[in-house]
Amino acid sequence: MTENSAVEVDEGVFESTAVIDNGSFGTRTIRFETGRLAQQAAGAVVAYLDDETMLLSATSASKHPKEHFDFFPLTVDVEERMYAAGRIPGSFFRREGRPSTDAILTCRLIDRPLRPSFVDGLRNEIQVVVTVMSLNPQDLYDVVAINAASASTQIAGLPFSGPVGGVRVALITSDENKAGQWVAFPTVEQLENAVFDMVVAGRIVSGSGDDADVAIMMVEAEATDNVISLIDGGAQAPTEAIVAEGLEAAKPFIARLCTAQQQLAAKASKPTGDFPVFPAYQDDVFAAVEAAAAEKLSAALTIAGKQERDDKTDEVKVEVLEQVAPNFEGREKELGAAFRSLTKKLVRQRILRDQFRIDGRGITDIRSLSAEVAIVPRAHGSALFERGETQILGVTTLDMVKMAQQVDSLGPETTKRYMHHYNFPPYSTGETGRVGSPKRREIGHGALAERALMPVLPSVEEFPYAIRQVSEALSSNGSTSMGSVCASTLALLNAGVPLKAPVAGIAMGLVSDQVDGETRYVALTDILGAEDAFGDMDFKVAGTKDFVTALQLDTKLDGIPSKVLAGALSQAKDARATILEVMAEAIDTPDEMSPFAPRVTAIKVPVDKIGEVIGPKGKMINSITEQTGANISIEDDGTVFVGATDGPSAQAAIDMINAIANPQLPKVGERFLGTVVKTTAFGAFVSLLPGRDGLVHISKLGSGKRIAKVEDVVSVGSKLRVEIADIDNRGKISLIPVEEDGAAAPAEQSEEAAAEK
């Protein structure tokens, strides 16, 4: 990697670059520019990736703080502009509407490392808007957006302890290098040969250049869709040790990106403004609350049950606040915040000193586990997974592949055959609240569970269905997202989906502090909601018994030693193995498909026969659908998906399609029980086979007698037993009626029987 300092390219326009060297995979250049666009924003930076991908990030701040807020009002928005890809939006009004799922997930990737980088107690509204203006279809813009947002915030004159660098690294294998190489900013094409990829964000805590000490702040990682086939081909599996190596490999790249942002800020940053901060409480308030509550609260926090513990804690809180409130009139909010801070202190002390947790468990203990399938009667697949007081219902629905979600965003994905939706109703925590469209958190949790399961799903050739998985968080006390992974695995198997391997997930936590003069770290397995809130790290790991399929990490620390992180990963693997054993007791192989699930079969027809199967204006395919009740979807490569509520209907449709695409030509002398499909002045057309009609001339219809009108003898829809009298050189078939004759039966065919051949 090479280093460049920021330069002034035009009057008031500055830029800096970070060149990422991936060895044999080439270099990527990230360029930051400020001073040209969006000059009224507090900070505005354009970030380029190799000059073709271009994002504008603008950071703004309100002039006056929101003193009544008890949280930091930071908003991050990502605007995908379709002109970035040279497209007109597909919506009715032909303009961009609500943000896509990709945009929402990118907002979360930006928010998670930026939010803890602001000074504690800030109450001014901060808004970061990232606009995707140009995008090379081989690039993914999310990590570029993290860097752009950090750079614009860094120069905005805000109390911000950045910059934050974000990088995507992928373990890409080749025939020559099965162990693989960690490549930064991989292209979409390169990711096809990757076994694992992750977005890592962090910042420099000391040093500079390649020797800088980088603190990891956020990780979002996943195994790729084709990881199992790559492993079968000899590639390195993404085990816990390999994932830890990837995190270390990302640090020099992050240092390079942070350095480029620092260089830009040195030239173009505004001086930090005077922003008032509103600490949650003053020291005198905390001292009073601690003196009054410490003993009672410590006792309350030893109660194992969540509801009983919360009730007792609330009781202590009311009692203590009534006791100390007269001494702090008008500072009620401080009292509540101090009580929460004391709770956090006591919980952490117990873990660090006694190695025991709120509910009495040891640091590696998992709460009681329960797994059950076939919960919802008419669902195609369902399961209930419980871990302590966390309860998740997973429900699987199968349908035709044409029901896959159509994705209209800037990402490379245009359709989603597997959709995972996560719902978190307010009653899951015993509260009231808004229900309706999903919040960003629900979209993020659903995406995490979706990524965890994608590597083990069968291909569309192996299982020609669209799959919708819904996770209902019925009760929550810690890591409903990882509970969703477990419930989904069970429900998918119950629905008959042939997963390549079962997947389970577990949430880990970390608590650290100075104990007896040294920093002590304690990794916690299966964290509670309170441990998540009061801990230093939230670390979710999902995977099979052999490798990691998804990982999400958020930390409040300036850095986690590699040894501690490796230990937490190993702890997570042990917990995952325990959970997989419990799940296997409920179901370990795919069940028979539900009688309520559609039967979908994939067949192939010659590409040049697609038009005949569809027919003029869809006449033939509509006819097959009407006669059989089956749903039919035809792909451009000749793959035909046939779905029906029962097997015989699907088979009838398949037979009719095969009769058209691979017809058995009728011969002179063959007899059929056909259907009259059209009458004319000169005769009646009779359908013998799908797509194959013959003509009975009017002179042959009267049994030797002259008739005036064809309709006097037959009408459309009439069944007529006929024999092929002649087939001319153009393939036109002449028919004659035959009498009902049992002796002729062996040589006769019905239209349906012929189709079954």
Swiss-Prot record:
Main localization of the protein described in the UniProt heading: cytoplasm
A Pfam cross-reference name: PNPase
Keywords, comma-separated and alphabetical: Cytoplasm, Magnesium, Metal-binding, Nucleotidyltransferase, RNA-binding, Transferase
Cross-referenced SUPFAM superfamilies: Eukaryotic type KH-domain (KH-domain type I), Nucleic acid-binding proteins, Polynucleotide phosphorylase/guanosine pentaphosphate synthase (PNPase/GPSI), domain 3, Ribonuclease PH domain 2-like, Ribosomal protein S5 domain 2-like
Domain KH: 598-657
Identification of the protein by name: Polyribonucleotide nucleotidyltransferase
One CC-aspect GO term: cytosol
GO biological process, one term: RNA processing
Organism per entry: Rhodococcus jostii (strain RHA1)
Name of the encoding gene: pnp
GO MF, any single term: polyribonucleotide nucleotidyltransferase activity
UniProt-annotated binding residues for Mg(2+): 532, 538
InterPro entries linked to this entry: ExoRNase_PH_dom1, ExoRNase_PH_dom2_sf, GPSI/PNP, KH_dom, KH_dom_type_1, KH_dom_type_1_sf, NA-bd_OB-fold, PNPase
